[in-house]
């Protein structure tokens, strides 16, 4: 135990070590220490002290050696790790290099036509370096691993050669291997060149126009491909075989690796346990060495001496009796005998444990490797063998059926592939048609888009033009309506002037007829006047007809407008127009009533005039001059009215020029132009008549010098007065008409607002129409697309019909095959019936055999139960016997020890004195107070679970080393289950 070394003694000396020892431990090594032995009485004591110092020095040297061994061990572990990493890297390089060589070999086998399989395998063996003899420990370990697994031979052989050879040999071997790899790559390049040449030759032959060369090339290519196919098949077989072997080897190696890992884990645990035991033993040895040194120093310091006889206490010395020393020696011998017995018992137990472990391992191996003969002799194996034979025959039959089914399946596959090819062709053709149709549709769509863009641009232009022409048209309509109203007013005035002219002409004719008997000049004038009135009467007929014509035209235009307005306007506006028309009709009726009243007044005035004429005849002479003045005034008034008419005519011309410059699109403009032309003609006729009347008046004024002329002048003056009255009435009517014009202007403004609303409605309708047109175009496009889809679906339906017909034919063929298969199934069912009968017979036999087997199994289970019971009883009896033997031995030892004590107590002359008795008691008490685990320290800790007392250090070490059980009763304890106690 002392040769194992002690770490703690060198680094951490015990608390009871003296300072002299500490100095010696610190200075041990290079310096030579002087040792003080103290007072020595004899040579024996000197030898003892020198031996003690030598022992101490040797212990220190052992500690140093142990530290050096630990450092060297760590260095060795580092080197081993480094060597393992180097070996692993070399293994990886070698493995990938071998894989590279293997790939090159497979490529050469794949493409090299002249190379055989045997040559290839020989080449593979040539690439492997031969295995050298192991020289080092690492190589020896690798050899052991190679003996375990044969799959790792090439890699480890290469590493073994590298480990056993020198640097020059390593370089030469690596150069050889590199050269071999380079040669293999060069072979691949040459092989590729050959293949390229062959391909070029064949392509040249095939591309040449000569049929014979092409046939030769095809035959050569066919033979080459068939040969290549055979080679590839052979290569695939070899590779499959190799893969199978490698997979088996891999599984074996994996199992070995698992077992090795489990063994390594077990060994690691064993190493940890042994290391812990070694540390424990070293600590114990250190404690004993310290204790021994302390005892020796105490003995030397206090001066204990041994004398041969007597036991008396001298000053500073204690005498020990020789008898006591002999007793101690006897006890020591007894303890040695007990220790020997214990060692023998431990060796027997260890031997038994080894035998049990070997038997256990043998049984495990036997369980893993069951005997084949024993298995074959079992009835279960025989039943399974018979079932296997039956199943094997059935499998052969099923294999035959499977071959037939495969042939059928191959036929159906070929037919299916043909059908698929036909369908694909149809699909390709349909795709082409669809693409062409899509292209056409895209072209048409592009054209339609262009047309749509053109129409949109035109529509925008027309909208812009309409927006620009809208206000102009409104202004023109406003002007036209105002001019129409003005023309109507002028027409009314013209009619009034015509009436006045007619009345004046009628009055003049009456005057001329009355004054015809007086003078010849008056006769001639009366004749002229008699001839003129019919002309004058005839002339107004023309303008009345002319006036009636524009009235009819204007009525027609108003009716057309009313119809349009009635169609466009809403019901509310129609009601308003109706109300306005009713008001206009009421105004017309009022005008008619006024005209009737005026005619009545005229009749009354004519009667009054006739009465006045009688009176005026008497007064004509006196008033002739006054009449001339009045006629001149009337003529002036007529001339002023003529000027006004001419001015209005000029305004009408300007308006006509404006109308002519405006676009002639509406009917209202045409009607206005026609009305204007008629009004111009009427004005020219009126001017001519006015001129004729002036000439006639001048002639009459020259002729009328007599009394008749004076009378006529008076009558004319009266007529002028009457006309002035009428003129006042006309002015009143004109004012009424102006008020009516204001009313009509307001109505016209209302109409304009209505027209604006109608224009907005028209725009909205145009927008709606535009939207409807775009929707219609879209719907037409969708309709076209739907038509095309319909045609495509019709084509698809036709193709599907053809496919259905083809599938119906296939179904018919399959039905025929089904009939054949049903017939074969019928025959098979008959055979199956026969076989089922045979199987039922075999089942009955098997049932009988199974019943017998069950009976035998029950008997065997009963026997096995009895055997297990007997074995358990034997084991229990053996255990009890061993316990009894152990207790018997312990009892014998106790009896012998107690017998010795009794003998010592019985001897009277051996009776010790009081001091010895006290010393024995003190020893007994000290033994009771010392810890039973270490036998060194005092008891100062208690376990609260079982209340056994030990030293605190032992309990703490047990807790730290996870041996958390009581040394006496094996009761488990935790961190809070022990604490210190103090015994006085």
From Swiss-Prot:
Coiled-coil intervals: 43-90, 236-378, 429-907
One cellular-component annotation, GO: HULC complex
UniProt keyword annotation of Zinc present: yes
Protein name: E3 ubiquitin-protein ligase BRE1A
Pathway: Protein modification; protein ubiquitination
Function: Component of the RNF20/40 E3 ubiquitin-protein ligase complex that mediates monoubiquitination of 'Lys-120' of histone H2B (H2BK120ub1). H2BK120ub1 gives a specific tag for epigenetic transcriptional activation and is also prerequisite for histone H3 'Lys-4' and 'Lys-79' methylation (H3K4me and H3K79me, respectively).
GO molecular function, one term: zinc ion binding
Polar residues bias (residue ranges): 514-526
Entry's localization field: Nucleus
KW Repeat (keyword) present: no
ZnF RING-type: positions: 931-970
Species: Gallus gallus (Chicken)
Assembly and binders: Component of the RNF20/40 complex (also known as BRE1 complex).
Residue stretches of biased makeup (Basic and acidic residues): 139-150, 527-540, 558-632
SMART domains in the record: RING
Residue stretches spanning the membrane: none
Biological processes, Gene Ontology terms: chromatin organization; protein ubiquitination
Catalytically driven reaction(s): S-ubiquitinyl-[E2 ubiquitin-conjugating enzyme]-L-cysteine + [acceptor protein]-L-lysine = [E2 ubiquitin-conjugating enzyme]-L-cysteine + N(6)-ubiquitinyl-[acceptor protein]-L-lysine
EC number(s) on file: 2.3.2.27
């Amino acid at each position: 135990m002392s040769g194992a070394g002690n770490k703690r003694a060198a680094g951490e000396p015990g608390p009871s070590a003296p300072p002299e020892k500490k100095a010696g431990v610190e200075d041990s090594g290079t310096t030579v220490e002087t040792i003080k032995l103290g007072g020595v009485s004899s040579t024996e004591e000197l030898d003892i002290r020198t031996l003690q110092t030598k022992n101490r020095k040797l212990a220190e040297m052992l500690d140093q050696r142990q530290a050096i061994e630990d450092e060297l061990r760590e260095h060795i572990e580092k080197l081993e790790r480094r060597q393992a990493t180097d070996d692993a890297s070399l293994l990886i390089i070698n493995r990938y290099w071998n894989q590279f060589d293997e790939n090159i070999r497979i490529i050469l086998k794949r493409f090299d036509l002249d190379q055989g399989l045997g040559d290839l395998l020989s080449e593979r063996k040539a690439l492997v370096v031969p295995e050298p003899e192991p020289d080092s420990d690492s190589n020896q370990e690798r050899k052991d691993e190679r003996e375990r697994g044969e799959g790792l031979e090439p890699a480890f052989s290469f590493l073994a050669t590298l480990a056993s050879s020198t640097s020059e040999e390593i370089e030469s071997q690596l150069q050889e291997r590199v050269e071999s790899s380079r040669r293999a790559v060069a072979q691949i390049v040459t092989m590729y060149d050959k293949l390229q040449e062959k391909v070029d030759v064949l392509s040249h032959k095939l591309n040449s126009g000569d049929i014979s060369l092409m046939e030769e090339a095809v035959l050569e290519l066919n033979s080459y491909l068939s040969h290549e196919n055979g080679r590839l098949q052979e290569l695939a077989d070899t590779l499959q075989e190799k893969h199978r072997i490698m997979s088996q080897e891999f599984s074996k190696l994996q199992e070995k690796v698992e077992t090795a890992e489990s063994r390594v884990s077990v060994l690691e645990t064993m190493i940890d346990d042994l290391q812990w035991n070694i540390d424990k033993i070293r600590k114990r040895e250190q404690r004993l060495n310290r204790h021994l040194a302390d005892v020796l120093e105490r003995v030397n310091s206090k001066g204990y001496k041994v004398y041969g006889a007597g036991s008396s206490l001298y000053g500073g010395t204690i005498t020990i009796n020789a008898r006591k020393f002999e007793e101690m020696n006897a006890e020591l011998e007894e303890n040695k005998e007990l220790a020997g017995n214990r060692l023998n018992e431990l060796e027997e137990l260890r031997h038994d444990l080894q035998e049990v472990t070997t038997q256990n391992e043998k049984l495990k191996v036997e369980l893993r490797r069951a005997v084949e003969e024993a298995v074959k002799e079992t009835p279960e194996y025989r039943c399974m063998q018979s079932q296997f034979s039956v199943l094997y025959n059935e499998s052969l039959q099923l294999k035959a059926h499977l071959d037939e089914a495969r042939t059928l399946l191959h036929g159906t596959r070929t037919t299916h592939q043909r059908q698929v090819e036909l369908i694909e062709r149809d699909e390709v053709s349909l795709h082409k048609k669809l693409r062409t149709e899509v292209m056409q549709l895209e072209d048409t769509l592009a054209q339609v888009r262009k047309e749509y863009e053109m129409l949109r641009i035109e529509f925008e232009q027309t909208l812009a033009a309409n927006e620009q022409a809208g206000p102009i048209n409104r202004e023109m309509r406003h002007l036209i309506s105002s001019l129409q109203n003005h023309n109507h007013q002028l027409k009314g005035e013209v009619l009034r002037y015509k009436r006045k002219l007619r009345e004046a002409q009628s009055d003049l004719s009456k005057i001329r007829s009355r004054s015809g008997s007086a003078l010849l000049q008056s006769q001639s004038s009366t004749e002229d006047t008699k001839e003129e009135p019919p002309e004058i009467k005839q002339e107004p007929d023309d303008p009345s007809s002319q006036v009636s014509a524009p009235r009819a035209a204007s009525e027609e235009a108003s009716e057309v407008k009313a119809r349009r307005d009635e169609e466009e306007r809403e019901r509310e506006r129609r009601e308003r127009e109706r109300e306005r028309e009713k008001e206009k009709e009421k105004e017309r009726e009022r005008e008619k009533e006024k005209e009737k009243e005026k005619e009545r007044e005229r009749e009354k005035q004519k009667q009054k005039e006739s009465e006045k004429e009688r009176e005026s005849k008497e007064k004509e002479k006196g008033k002739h001059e006054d009449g001339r003045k009045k006629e001149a005034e009337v003529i002036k008034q007529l001339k002023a009215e003529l000027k006004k008419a001419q001015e209005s005519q000029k305004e009408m011309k300007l308006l006509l020029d404006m109308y002519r410059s405006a676009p002639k699109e509406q009917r209202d403009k045409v009607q206005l132009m026609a009305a204007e032309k008629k009004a111009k003609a009427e004005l020219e006729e009126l001017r001519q008549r006015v001129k004729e009347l002036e000439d006639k008046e001048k002639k009459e004024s020259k002729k009328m010098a007599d009394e008749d002329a004076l009378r006529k002048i008076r009558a004319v003056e009266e007529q002028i007065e009457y006309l002035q009255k009428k003129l006042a009435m006309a002015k009143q009517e004109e004012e009424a008409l102006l008020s009516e014009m204001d009313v009509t202007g307001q109505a016209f403004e209302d109409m304009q607002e209505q027209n604006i609303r109608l224009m907005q409605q028209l725009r909205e309708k145009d927008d709606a129409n535009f939207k409807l047109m775009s929707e219609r175009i879209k719907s037409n496009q969708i309709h076209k697309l739907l038509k095309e889809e319909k045609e495509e679906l019709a084509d698809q339906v036709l193709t599907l019909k053809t496919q259905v017909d083809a599938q119906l034919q296939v179904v018919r063929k399959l039905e025929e095959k089904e009939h054949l298969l049903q017939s074969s199934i019928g025959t098979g069912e008959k055979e199956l019936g026969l076989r089922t009968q045979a199987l039922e017979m075999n089942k009955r036999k098997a049932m009988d055999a199974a019943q017998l087997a069950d009976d035998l199994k029950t008997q065997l289970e009963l026997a096995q139960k009895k055997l297990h019971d007997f074995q358990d009883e034997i084991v229990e009896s053996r255990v009890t016997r061993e316990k009894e033997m152990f207790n018997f031995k312990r009892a014998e030892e106790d009896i012998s020890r107690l017998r010795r004590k009794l003998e010592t107590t019985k001897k009277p002359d051996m009776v010790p004195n009081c001091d010895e008795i006290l010393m024995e008691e003190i020893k007994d008490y000290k033994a009771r107070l010392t810890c039973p685990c270490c036998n060194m320290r005092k008891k100062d800790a208690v376990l609260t679970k079982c209340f056994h007392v030990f030293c605190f250090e032992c309990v703490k070490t047990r807790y730290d080393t996870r041996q958390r059980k009581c040394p006496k009763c094996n009761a488990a304890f935790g961190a809070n289950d022990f604490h210190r106690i103090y015994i006085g």
